[in-house]
């Protein structure tokens, strides 16, 4: 079961096999999760299996899985997940190395300030990749607070747009200042809204952000 940024348990043939967080009947009893769920099981004697997925999303009203629930042999799924984990780990590492390179370059060439903004852009994109499937950050930092994980997941998009817009402005000297300031203000307000506002309210407006 893909990451749902909420909580769920997977019950197979009457036995709890895996889960994300802890489903509850209210926001007080729910503990939201921040990773994926992988459950191994064997079918019953008649070749069938009863699979029940319990979900609750009191912290994130739009929480839910938007990807397929994958069934297959344990070996095949494990190989697929390990490949994805290595691929996205490599992607994040390359982006971070790029950002470090550009930061060092900026320290040695003060006349090119736009390099620093490109470094910030690559760092933000790397963070964004790490908080989506296969959720590298959740494995590196298992105790990361769910609220912080939520903020990193959704603020990374306006922040990346903000840094990249400033980078473009610095390197090309944009003539249409009102367009530049409009994008910058919108990105700053969007980021501030995500950081300050309770997640229950934020989740109701995320589709607007995604549409923009």
Describe each region flagged by the PLM.
Residues 89-212:
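Juxtamembrane segments at transmembrane-helix boundaries
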Residues 13, 63-64, 135-136:
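Short, solvent-exposed loop/turn and secondary-structure capping segments
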Residues 31-89, 93:
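An acidic-aromatic loop/edge-strand motif
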Residues 1-13, 51-53:
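Aromatic-lined ligand-binding clefts that engage carbohydrates, nucleic acids, or primary amines
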Residues 13-15, 155:
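Residue-level recognition of short loop/turn positions
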Residues 15-36:
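Solvent-exposed beta-strand/loop surfaces of large extracellular or lumenal domains
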Residues 8, 19, 48, 60-62, ...:
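Intrinsically disordered, low-complexity acidic/polar segments
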